[in-house]
Amino acid sequence: MGSSKKQGHLVLPTVELIDQLQELLKDSIRPIEIGAGAGNLGRFLNIPMTDAMIQRKPEIAAYYKMIEQPTINYPQEVDHLEAMDAVRRYHPWTVVASWVTQLYKTKADEGTSMVDGVDEENILKHVKKYILIGHEKIHGTKRILKTHRFTTIDPQWVVSRGEASGNRIWIFEGENE
């Protein structure tokens, strides 16, 4: 785990996680990963990997340095695309995201969102399924949990920076039928 933290990885692509995601993607057409970071999930799933690469912005990199957190070293195979641009380019049925922060929209979002965050409500308008891997303490207050239908998997085998009991996989029903 120490090495993954030093390299900016938030979740590790365990065999169990990849198997579960492959099962969730089995009937999907053109699935993609957004917020892919180093591409650890998409690479094993053999799907396009995209990321807005905001950690390359000087002000974001400086913030991470200040809080002593590593920034991601984005590999070439990760496309530099904001999440909605990736959805427009690839027209996926399913989007996979891991530890993404939602887009800041209202004052009520403070502390749980950012101006460079993902507009998950908009993504859900364009896909059939949105799979979010995250942690209850960090992602459990997302707006989409109040506005969209979802099921939850509480996997004890997801390895992340958070305590294992809070790790979750949320599977949202998109609006694009």
Describe each PLM feature range.
Residues 105-176:
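C-terminal substrate-binding/active-site "lid" region of AdoMet-derived donor-dependent transferases
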Residues 28-37:
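Conserved class I S-adenosyl-L-methionine
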Residues 95-98, 132:
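Redox-cofactor binding/interface segments in oxidoreductases and associated redox assembly factors
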Residues 1-26, 53-94:
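S-adenosyl-L-methionine
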Residues 100-103:
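Short glycine-rich anion-binding loops that position phosphate/pyrophosphate groups of nucleotides
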Residues 49-54, 134:
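Conserved acidic E/D residue at the C-terminus of a beta-strand in Rossmann-like folds
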Residues 39-43:
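Glycine-rich SAM-binding Motif I of class I
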